[in-house]
């Protein structure tokens, strides 16, 4: 082979590596990038927007539902790219109010992106391939199974394709059923636009400025069958895929925070759990039900270690976060409930129509007819949503730093592997705690449920946690540097953890970024990278840049201990 041919072959190899990748992790990563770029281009088209390249960042209405302020800015490709990343990674962070900025076409593009990202691009490609090109006797190549296992599979390669089919069909059925339920509820439930409690120019804390009550203006979806159908299925897709993107306005699910709106909250909670628990858990449950019907009531199914760890850790983390929030909210003197119960001079800055209300009446308007019970439900919905969904029934900028700190922990952990959720994942946390437990007890192996966990899995768990923590904290430190408005470290950490956990809850930092996209280019890109990392998983993100055949693996040096700690 001549030098010219060698040079050409080397160039083609480099192009293949850059455009296609060398390993399975790299190829999946490339697929994701191409989907995001295509989505960004579609979202940047003029007919994807309601107005001529203008975005609505936020707006406020008074108690009568009249718009008293609307924050707008020029819409650029950075906004389209950021939302495409957010939708495909099923995060929900946005520099715009989606319902006010995007047309039906734009909203349809978002729905497709969040479906592709949630179910899995490779998984959907596999299902389409299976539908239109039948394999002989249902056999699939080893490489195809590896691709599926890498994106959404479990530990058993042999059952991967069956697990994918069962889990995705179940989630599609849930999306369809819940879509009709949402349609009925959105049509009939009287929901109203959210109005501010305090004057925006009032000398009160940002926490109090974020408080909202219902105005007298009904949402356009009420008694509008076309919109109810559109909203119903969009939010069904968004909830199952743990996306957190909504069409309800500037305050997410806040219009449904009380009364009959609680039914919608419970529907969303169940969908969030279905989408975030993991494909292996869904398949394990399917196998248990199928075999129990086949062999009778005396059959005892042996659930996998993954299922046991994922379900148990999910329950423990959710219960811990919820109890901590309850303690803070009803015991700590600086909690939001106590703050509203003891308002004094701040009452002078209430909006017209609320100035003569007592503190008790204000609590009822803000939280609901039974304030304590409604507040408990709001916190419960917040805990479930913080695991990866991103819907909110209350502005998180109104919460105290202590509550935000608890939510940061929940968002950082995230949901289960092989699901629509992000974060370090529940099984990672379980392996870390089990390793610490074994170390303190002097045990040589990490054991749980009569099984031993492989040493490499332990190393991977600590790698994922440390890499994720360093990334989130480092970007949280850098995030406020280019902001044109002050941003506390807690709010910055809340935003970066929300991106990494693919949650979508916001403390307001994303809206500040939206005012000057060019100035905040670094923040756009770093939050986008965190969202992709959270979606793909830290392990896969790191593996994307790992050499396939690294030098130095063919030999080893003599070992020597190093004192640590």
From Swiss-Prot:
The keyword Cell division does not apply. Keywords: Cell membrane, Ion transport, Membrane, Transmembrane, Transmembrane helix, Transport. One of its GO terms (molecular function) is monoatomic cation transmembrane transporter activity. GO terms for cellular component: plasma membrane. Its main location: membrane. The chain crosses the membrane at residues 28-48, 73-93, 109-129, 169-189, 262-282, 315-335, 364-384, 393-413, 461-481, 526-546. GO terms for biological process: metal ion transport. PANTHER family: KTR SYSTEM POTASSIUM UPTAKE PROTEIN B, TRK SYSTEM POTASSIUM UPTAKE PROTEIN TRKG-RELATED. This is Uncharacterized cation transporter MG322 homolog.
């Amino acid at each position: 082979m001549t030098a010219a041919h060698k040079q050409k072959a080397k160039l083609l190899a480099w192009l293949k590596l850059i455009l296609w990748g060398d390993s399975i992790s790299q190829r999946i990563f490339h697929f994701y990038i191409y989907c995001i770029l295509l989505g960004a281009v579609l979202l940047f088209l003029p007919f994807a927007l309601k107005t001529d390249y203008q975005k609505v960042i936020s707006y406020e209405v008074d108690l009568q539902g009249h718009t008293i302020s609307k924050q707008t800015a020029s819409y650029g490709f950075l906004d389209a790219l950021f939302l495409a990343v957010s939708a495909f990674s099923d995060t929900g962070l946005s520099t715009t109010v989606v319902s006010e900025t995007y047309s039906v076409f734009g909203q349809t593009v978002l729905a497709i992106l969040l479906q592709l990202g949630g179910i899995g691009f490779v998984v959907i490609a596999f299902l389409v391939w299976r539908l239109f090109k039948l394999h002989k006797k249902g056999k699939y190549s080893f490489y195809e199974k590896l691709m599926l296992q890498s994106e959404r599979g479990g530990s058993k390669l042999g059952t991967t394709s069956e697990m994918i089919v069962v889990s995705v069909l179940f989630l599609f059925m849930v999306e369809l059923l819940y879509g009709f339920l949402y349609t009925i509820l959105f049509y009939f439930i009287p929901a109203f636009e959210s109005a501010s409690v305090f004057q925006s120019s009032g000398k009160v804390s940002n926490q109090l400025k974020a408080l909202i009550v219902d105005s007298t203006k009904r949402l356009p979806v009420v008694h509008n069958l076309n919109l109810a159908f559109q909203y119903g299925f969009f939010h069904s897709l968004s909830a199952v895929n743990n996306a957190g993107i909504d069409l309800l306005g500037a305050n997410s699910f806040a219009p449904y925070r009380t009364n009959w709106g609680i039914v919608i909250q419970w529907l969303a909670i169940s969908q969030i759990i279905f989408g975030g628990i993991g494909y292996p858990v869904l398949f394990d449950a399917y196998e248990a039900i199928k075999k129990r019907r086949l062999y009778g009531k005396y059959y005892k199914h042996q659930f996998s270690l993954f299922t046991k760890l994922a379900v148990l850790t999910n329950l423990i983390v959710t219960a811990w976060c919820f109890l901590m929030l309850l303690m803070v909210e009803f015991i700590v003197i600086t909690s939001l409930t106590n703050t509203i119960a003891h308002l004094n001079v701040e009452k002078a800055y209430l909006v017209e129509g609320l100035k003569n209300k007592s503190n008790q009446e204000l609590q009822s308007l803000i939280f609901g007819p039974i304030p304590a019970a409604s507040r408990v439900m709001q916190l419960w919905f917040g805990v479930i949503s913080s695991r990866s969904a991103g819907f909110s029934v209350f502005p998180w900028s109104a919460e105290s730093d202590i509550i935000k700190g608890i939510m940061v922990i929940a968002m950082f952990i995230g949901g289960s592997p092989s699901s629509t959720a992000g974060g370090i994942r529940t099984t990672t946390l379980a392996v870390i705690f089990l390793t610490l437990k074994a170390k303190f007890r002097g045990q040589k192996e990490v054991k749980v449920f009569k099984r031993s966990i492989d040493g490499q899995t332990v190393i991977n768990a600590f790698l994922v946690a440390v890499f994720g923590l360093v990334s989130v904290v480092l970007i949280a430190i850098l995030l406020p540097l280019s902001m044109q408005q002050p941003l506390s470290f807690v709010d910055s950490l809340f935003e970066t953890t929300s991106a990494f956990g693919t949650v979508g809850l916001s403390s307001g930092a994303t809206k500040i970024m939206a005012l000057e996209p060019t100035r905040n280019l670094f923040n756009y890109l770093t939050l986008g990278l965190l969202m992709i990392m959270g979606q793909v998983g830290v392990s896969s993100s790191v593996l994307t840049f790992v050499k396939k055949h690294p030098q130095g693996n063919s030999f080893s040096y003599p070992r020597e201990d190093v004192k640590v700690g």
